[in-house]
Amino acid sequence: MLNLLLTILTYVDLRATWQADAMKDSQMLQDTQLQSSNEQTQIMQQQTNEEALVQLELEGSEDSVSTEQYTAVLQKMSQIAAKFESLLQNLMAKTQAKEREIEQRITAREPKIKAVDADIESLQETLDKSTEEQFTYMQS
């Protein structure tokens, strides 16, 4: 009976460890999403700043803007947009890869926790029967 109790306690400890790991992974997932959101905001702010500088450059030129100047400004704006679009896509790809990795760990752990729960329940039933049998034996 003592071995049964020790086994149950070991399983309970194992389950608690896995659940704590799952909570850490969930927190890591939230932190990853928050960090990604903050980085996206920074990238978009940088893009806005660069576009504003180009706009100032255009506004600071003489009263009349030549077609070449206007075309050059449009090209700069297009380059800026492409640069920051690429930065955002790279960030999203990294974030999604990290999220998938964390979610896979969480998902892989779930069946183990369920299996340990089932084992604990089965061992508890065995312990209950054994305790009941001992009690009955001692009463007779």
Each predicted region: which residue ranges?
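Amphipathic alpha-helical polymerization modules
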Residues: 1-140
